[in-house]
């Protein structure tokens, strides 16, 4: 009878260790699968953005986005007004 006392506790401890390690391994596997799915989605998003960037060409310069209506006859008649120049405005404003 004394033979079973030690082996009973040892058996339940082994079961806890076995099930605990299996559970931990399962959680790690689940984590790897979730990270893989997120990485695939991120990769597809990057490829789509790269494809859209290639289709649209280079990004337009901010000055070209202003779309100021100026006809070609106005350009030839227009004299450069230095009072609107940034350096001129910066010099005339007190600091």
From Swiss-Prot:
Transmembrane helix in keyword set = yes
Q: Which Pfam families does this UniProt record tie to the protein?
A: LST1
State the organism named in the record: Mus musculus (Mouse)
Which keywords accompany this UniProt record? Cell shape, Immunity, Membrane, Phosphoprotein, Transmembrane, Transmembrane helix
Alphabetically, which GO biological process terms does the record hold? cell morphogenesis; dendrite development; immune response; negative regulation of lymphocyte proliferation; regulation of cell shape
Task: Kindly state the tissue distribution recorded for this protein.
Answer: Expressed in spleen and at lower levels in thymus and liver.
Q: What job does the chain carry out?
A: Possible role in modulating immune responses. Has an inhibitory effect on lymphocyte proliferation. Induces morphological changes including production of filopodia and microspikes when overexpressed in a variety of cell types and may be involved in dendritic cell maturation.
Keyword check for Calcium, yes or no. Answer: no
- Mind telling me which residue stretches traverse the membrane in this protein? 22-42
Q: What is the lineage of its organism?
A: Eukaryota, Metazoa, Chordata, Craniata, Vertebrata
Q: What family does the Swiss-Prot or TrEMBL record give for this protein?
A: Belongs to the LST1 family.
Listed InterPro entries: Leukocyte-sp_tscrpt_1_LST1
Q: What protein name applies here?
A: Leukocyte-specific transcript 1 protein
- What does the record say about its membrane topology? Single-pass membrane protein
């Amino acid at each position: 009878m004394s033979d079973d006392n030690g082996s009973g506790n040892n058996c339940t401890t082994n079961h806890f260790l076995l099930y605990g390690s299996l559970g931990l391994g399962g959680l790690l596997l689940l984590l790897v699968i979730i990270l893989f799915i997120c990485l695939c989605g991120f990769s597809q998003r990057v490829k789509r953005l790269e494809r859209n960037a290639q289709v649209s060409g280079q990004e337009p310069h901010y000055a070209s986005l202003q779309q100021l209506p100026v006809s070609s006859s106005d350009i030839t008649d227009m004299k450069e007004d230095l009072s609107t120049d940034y350096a001129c405005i910066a010099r005339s404003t007190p600091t």
